[in-house]
């Protein structure tokens, strides 16, 4: 419980996030992302990712027989929301649920961070999509603690408060990056939704998935993180 609370507080920090939430301990950020993909998509489904991305997103999908559809990340010097919309609308034609990855802030490998206005526009569109399709947004924040604007790096999370009841956000956190402790394999999946029952349903499934896959993550890694963020 101490670790899960510490992860949630570290992830949101001063951001005024008012959503129901829970945290699943994972072996690094990669464990959080892979478990989320496996939880919210079935074989034959399609995962939406950026065209410029960490290669393991596609690999994680592939080993689970999940297809990948890529949106163009940039339009000149800004986030290409038009391509995101077109890609989601394409996937909507073949399945009744949407799962997409946004690697932000400090996108790997470009370093780009969406503006708060870009996040507002994205959330507004996902709410429209959610009128007919359930939506899960995987927000990979592996490099958030390397932001040039560290003091405001979590501000965008306040836009999450506007999600509809049919949208869920899972924030994928990596202690491996935040504390440069790669070998300890420590991270978390922070589940966010408007309703407690939606969070609990996802939490139960992800707990079972974790138990069946890696059982538990190292206690030393969890204890180390709690000590650093509370007493270190």
Language model features: what each stretch is:
Residues 1-133, 144-163:
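Conserved core of the PLP fold type I
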Residues 47, 135-137, 169:
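Hydrophobic/aromatic residues located in beta-strands of well-ordered beta-sheets
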Residues 140-141:
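Walker B catalytic acidic pair
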Residues 161-232:
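Conserved core segment of the aminotransferase class I/II
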């Amino acid at each position: 419980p101490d670790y899960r609370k510490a992860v949630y507080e570290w992830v949101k920090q001063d951001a005024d996030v008012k959503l129901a939430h829970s945290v699943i301990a994972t072996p690094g950020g990669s464990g959080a992302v892979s478990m989320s993909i496996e939880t919210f998509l079935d074989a034959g489904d399609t995962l939406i990712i950026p065209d410029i991305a960490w290669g393991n997103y596609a690999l994680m999908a592939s080993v689970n027989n999940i297809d990948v559809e890529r949106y163009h990340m940039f339009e000149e010097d800004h986030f290409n929301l038009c391509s995101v919309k077109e890609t989601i609308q394409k996937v909507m034609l073949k399945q009744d649920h949407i799962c997409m990855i946004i690697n932000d802030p400090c996108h790997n490998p470009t370093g780009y961070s969406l503006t708060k206005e870009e996040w507002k526009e994205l959330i507004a569109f996902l709410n429209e999509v959610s009128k007919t399709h359930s939506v899960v947004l995987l927000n990979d924040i592996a490099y958030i603690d390397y932001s040039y604007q560290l003091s405001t790096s979590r501000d965008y999370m306040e836009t999450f408060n506007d999600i509809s009841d049919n949208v869920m956000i899972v924030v994928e956190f990596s202690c491996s990056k935040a504390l440069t402790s790669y070998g300890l394999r420590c991270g978390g999946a922070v589940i966010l939704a408007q309703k407690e029952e939606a969070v609990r349903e996802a939490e139960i499934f992800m707990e079972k998935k974790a138990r069946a896959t890696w059982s538990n993550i190292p206690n030393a890694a969890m204890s180390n993180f709690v000590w650093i963020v509370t007493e270190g």
